[in-house]
Design a protein with these regions (language model features):
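Helix-turn-helix
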Residues: 20, 24, 28, 32-66, ...
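Hydrophobic alpha-helical connector segments
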Residues: 70, 84-113, 162-169, 191
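Short coil/turn segments at alpha/beta junctions that flank glycine-rich nucleotide-binding fingerprints
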Residues: 35-39, 111, 153
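Amphipathic alpha-helical packing segments from all-alpha helical-bundle domains
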Residues: 77-80, 107-110, 126-153, 163-167, ...
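N-terminal intrinsically disordered/low-complexity leader segments
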Residues: 1-20, 157-159, 206-210
């Protein structure tokens, strides 16, 4: 038991001091998985891409499956973070909509290849299925709660029940994000159009500048 604690302490200390190497491994793993798939990809592929030794890999991750799970959690957190809009007036639905929709679309476009792999793994891996469900459902339910708060305060008159509206807008964002993944130059136009559609469906009260 003491040996286990010592090993964990060493690993934790190195996590703090060598965070850049861990970050490179994560970025490399996402690129390798996107190119090769989870099955064919190897630890050697990841370390070569990251320019980190195999020994360095095992300081942070026990296997390629573990780093894949860490990536899945990171994607989930990226979508949740897209709904957090620091520096934006949360009482302004227009500003919140533009910022959060832009962040969500950008995150989905960036992680699209990995999302496809996550969906595949979710069919056979219960732990991955739970993560996949969180990726899809947590942002939607959080968005629905936000719509309800706006409605209760008289700042919105949504065209549908909040959860249904949140799902619909999420689907629109995903569709546009897929297009942006192939055509990045359309990002700003997409954010503008999706934001306009969302605000119309939300029945947002016009802001003071309008």
């Amino acid at each position: 038991m003491a040996r286990t604690h010592k090993a964990w302490a060493v690993r934790t200390a190195r996590d703090r001091t060598e965070a850049p190497a861990r970050a490179r491994l994560l970025e490399a793993a996402e690129a390798v998985f996107a190119q090769l798939g989870l099955g064919p990809a190897t630890v050697a592929d990841i370390t070569t891409e990251a320019e980190v030794s195999r020994a360095g890999f095992y300081v942070y991750f026990a296997s390629k499956e573990e780093i894949f799970r860490v990536l899945a959690v990171r994607v989930r957190d990226a979508f949740l973070a897209a709904q957090e809009v620091p520096g934006v007036d949360t009482d302004d639905p227009h500003a919140v909509a533009e910022a959060s929709i832009g962040a969500f679309i950008a995150a989905y476009a960036r992680h699209q290849p990995l999302l496809g792999l996550l969906e595949q793994q979710a069919r056979t891996d219960p732990a991955m299925a739970q993560l996949w469900d969180e990726i899809r459902e947590r942002p939607v339910h959080r968005h629905a709660r936000y719509i309800r708060r706006l409605t209760d305060r008289g700042l919105a008159a949504p065209a549908a029940e909040p959860l249904a509206l949140a799902r619909a807008v999420g689907g629109i964002c995903v569709e546009f994000a897929r297009r942006i993944a192939a055509h990045p130059d359309t990002y700003e136009d997409a954010v503008r159009e999706v934001t306009a559609m969302y605000l119309h469906l939300l029945g947002a009260v016009p802001n003071r500048q309008e």
